[in-house]
Amino acid sequence: MKNLVKLSLIAMLTAATLPAMAAKSEPYTHQGTNAREMLVEQPIHWISVDQLKKELEGKAPMNISFDIDETVLFSSPCFYHGQQKYSPGKQDYLKNQDFWNEVNAGCDQYSIPKQIAVDLINMHQERGDQIYFITGRTAEDKDGVTPVLQKAFNIKNMHPVEFMGGRDRTTKYNKTPGIIEHKVTIHYGDSDDDILAAKEAGVRGIRLMRAANSTYQPMPTLGGYGEEVLINSSY
């Protein structure tokens, strides 16, 4: 009898404590996180400049291409200025040729070269690789971009920038023809279109991270197409 009473008391106490442990006093109002979630790392294929350099050792010189905006240059200041001037609060300025004319004519003198681009270009030039810049910008009569890039990155054998915006093409992505034309082996870029253009051209696409304060929104998903992503490449 005494044992039965003891078991009953234990059962009652256990039942009384369970709701207090399991139930929330109020439903959450924000997404939040927890200790386990904070420790979860996404399965991204990270790569460094040093790893690339070692991997390419002993290989013949090759042709390399780079996107420009948010890949080699932090050009958000130009785009912010353009938006305020041509279409405040809207993205219409990107379809305005006057904006592209202004950017290509010399606005990039206010863009900031990214350190990751300096490191990559130095590494490739030391190997004897040829550097090409392929952009989705629309061209105009005056090209003020090529000299800015040549000076910023000390390009030894500078090729004119390839402006792919508005060009006729048979490919899905506008940078694909430039990648194919120049027989590129590796294409670097920050956008989904860069990675997809590289895939379409059948070459290796490597993602650079976009700066957190970039005006180019929304942010792309790093490694979203299984591509390699350069560490510390947002600056």
From Swiss-Prot:
Comment on bound cofactor: Binds 1 Mg(2+) ion per subunit.
Family, per entry: Belongs to the class B bacterial acid phosphatase family.
Active site: D67 (nucleophile), D69 (proton donor)
Keyword Magnesium: yes
GO cellular component: outer membrane-bounded periplasmic space
Name of the protein in question: Class B acid phosphatase
Species annotation: Aggregatibacter actinomycetemcomitans serotype C (strain D11S-1)
InterPro entries, per database record: Acid_phosphat_B-like (IPR005519), HAD-like_sf (IPR036412), HAD-SF_ppase_IIIB_AphA (IPR010025), HAD_sf (IPR023214)
Subunit structure: Homotetramer.
Cellular location(s): Periplasm
Top-level class of the enzyme under EC nomenclature: hydrolase
Signal sequence, renumbered to the chain: 1-22
Enzyme Commission (EC) number: 3.1.3.2
Task of the protein: Dephosphorylates several organic phosphate monoesters. Also has a phosphotransferase activity catalyzing the transfer of low-energy phosphate groups from organic phosphate monoesters to free hydroxyl groups of various organic compounds.
Gene symbol of the encoding locus: aphA
One Pfam family per UniProt: Acid_phosphat_B
Main location: periplasm
Keywords: Hydrolase, Magnesium, Metal-binding, Periplasm, Signal
UniProt: Mg(2+) binding residues: D67, D69, D190
Catalytic activity: a phosphate monoester + H2O = an alcohol + phosphate
Binding sites annotated in the UniProt record for substrate: T135, G136, K175
Entries under SUPFAM superfamilies matching the protein: HAD-like
Cofactor(s) annotated in UniProt: Mg(2+)
Recorded GO MF terms: acid phosphatase activity; metal ion binding
Keyword Hydrolase: yes
